[in-house]
A protein has these predicted regions:
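Conserved functional acidic sites
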Residues: 1-164
C-alpha cells in the first residue's frame, strides 16, 4: 500500500522470530513494527517515530514504538536515537569496501499502568553498514556482545536451519 518495501526479521538464537520491521524501500522509513509478545503471539506495535537510518553525519534520526511487555498487563516503550559516527574502509568476505558506523542510544522502558511503576534501561549500540552488503557488524558499548557477519545464507539453507 505504501510502494515497494522490505521486511527485516530478527530471530533468537534458538530460531524463534522475535521482531520484524517493514521498511519503505524508497525512504527507508519504518512502515510497520511487529513484535512477539509474552504469549508468543505476533503483535503490531504502535509507531510514534519511524526513522532508523540517518542519511548523513549531520542528521539524527529517532524511532519510537510501544508494544505489550513480556509480563502480563505491562507495556514496553522503545526509543532509539541514531547518528552516523564515521565512515571507514573495511574488508567483507575478502572485498575491500566503504562503510559507515552508526551510534545508537536506546532506552527500553517497561510501564505498568496499574502500579504506575516504570523500569528503564538505557544502552548504547554501534552498527556498521558496508556498501553492497548492508549490516555487517554490531556491538554494545562495553563490547560484551559483538556480532559480525560471517556468512550469507541461501534461502534453502536458512529454511533447513529453522526446521531442524
Amino acid at each position: 500500500s505504501e510502494g515497494k518495501h522490505i521486511i527485516v526479521e530478527r530471530y533468537s538464537q534458538d530460531g524463534r522470530l522475535t521482531e520484524a520491521l517493514n521498511y519503505n524501500l524508497d525512504s527507508l522509513n519504518v512502515i510497520d513494527h511487529m513484535v512477539v509478545n509474552g504469549l508468543g503471539e505476533n503483535e503490531k506495535a504502535t509507531l510514534y517515530k519511524n526513522n532508523l537510518l540517518p542519511f548523513n553525519s549531520e542528521e539524527e534520526v529517532t524511532f519510537a514504538s510501544k508494544f505489550s511487555g513480556f509480563v502480563d498487563s505491562t507495556l514496553m516503550l522503545l526509543e532509539k536515537n541514531r547518528v552516523i559516527m564515521d565512515t571507514l574502509s573495511l574488508e567483507v568476505f575478502s572485498n575491500k569496501t566503504e562503510a559507515f558506523r552508526i551510534k545508537e542510544n536506546a532506552s527500553y522502558t517497561l510501564l505498568n499502568p496499574f502500579t504506575e511503576k516504570e523500569q528503564r534501561q538505557d544502552l548504547t549500540l554501534y552498527y556498521i553498514f558496508a556498501k553492497g552488503f548492508g549490516l555487517v557488524e554490531w556491538y554494545d558499548e562495553a563490547n560484551k556482545s559483538h556480532y559480525k557477519l560471517e556468512e550469507i545464507l541461501s534461502q534453502d539453507k536458512w529454511i533447513k536451519m529453522l526446521t531442524r
